């Protein structure tokens, strides 16, 4: 995290700019082109509906952490934000656990379990997550007979940490607040029923 801003001013600023740039891409997606000439009513309506759906997605991120994690765009935006705080390993571990649970092969399960442990859980791991010693040892024990639930405790604690710590800061960040404001304007720019047809002047 950017605790020592005086030591890493350029890096922190660069990551903050990267976050704003990535969210800027989402902003661009959420805007209708001002040039609607030459497209059919069906194409315009489809684009309008997708744009409204994206705006609703963005606004949903502030409703609950679950909605954020269930949104691909939300995860991407949150990950970009976490990179500015040098804490992206928490989300990456959570995502790795979600993918891990989908594995059905016992051989692959054991192999992947050890890989995740070495990457995120063991002491001095390259992307070591912030969990207590007891949870680390419990997870290590679980690897002796790996199942899809062997990371559940560690994943749960990491999720709680993100929800209580990083998530509120994400919602208060200027980049997300700008994005949410744009989404709010977009979602109220037309009646909730059928979208108005584009004008062809």
Curated annotation (Swiss-Prot):
Its main location: membrane. The modification Phosphotyrosine is found at residues 167, 176. Residues 181-201 are annotated as: Disordered. Keywords: GTPase activation, Lipoprotein, Membrane, Palmitate, Phosphoprotein, Signal transduction inhibitor. It comes from the Eukaryota. InterPro entries: RGS (IPR016137), RGS_sf (IPR036305), RGS_subdom1/3 (IPR024066), RGS_subdomain_2 (IPR044926). GO terms for cellular component: cytoplasm; membrane. It is found in: Membrane. GO terms for biological process: G protein-coupled receptor signaling pathway; negative regulation of signal transduction; positive regulation of GTPase activity. Palmitoylated on Cys-2 and/or Cys-12. Phosphorylated. Phosphorylation at Tyr-167 by EGFR enhances GTPase accelerating (GAP) activity toward GNAI1. Retinal; also predominantly expressed in the liver and pituitary. Interacts with GNAI1 and GNAQ. Interacts with GNAI3, GNAI3 and GNAO1. PANTHER family: REGULATOR OF G PROTEIN SIGNALING, REGULATOR OF G-PROTEIN SIGNALING 16. This is Regulator of G-protein signaling 16. It comes from Mus musculus (Mouse). The lineage of its organism: Eukaryota, Metazoa, Chordata, Craniata, Vertebrata. The gene is Rgs16.
């Amino acid at each position: 995290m950017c605790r020592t801003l005086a030591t890493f001013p350029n890096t922190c600023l660069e990551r903050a700019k990267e976050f704003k740039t990535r969210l800027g891409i989402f902003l661009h997606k959420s805007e209708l082109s001002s040039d609607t000439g030459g497209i059919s009513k069906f194409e315009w309506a489809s684009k309008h509906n997708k744009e409204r759906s994206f705006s609703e997605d963005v606004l949903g991120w502030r409703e609950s952490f679950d909605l954020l994690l269930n949104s691909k765009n939300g995860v991407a935006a949150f990950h970009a934000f976490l990179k500015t705080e040098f804490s992206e390993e928490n989300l990456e571990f959570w995502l790795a656990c979600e993918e891990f649970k989908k594995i059905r092969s016992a051989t692959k399960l054991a192999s992947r379990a050890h890989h995740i442990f070495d990457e995120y859980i063991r002491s001095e791991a390259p992307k070591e997550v912030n969990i207590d010693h007891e949870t680390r040892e419990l997870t290590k024990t679980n690897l002796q007979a790996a199942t899809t639930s062997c990371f559940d405790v560690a994943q749960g604690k990491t999720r709680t940490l993100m929800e209580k710590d990083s998530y509120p800061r994400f919602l208060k960040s200027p980049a997300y607040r700008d994005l949410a404001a744009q989404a709010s304007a977009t979602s109220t720019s037309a009646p909730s029923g059928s979208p108005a047809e584009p004008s062809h002047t």
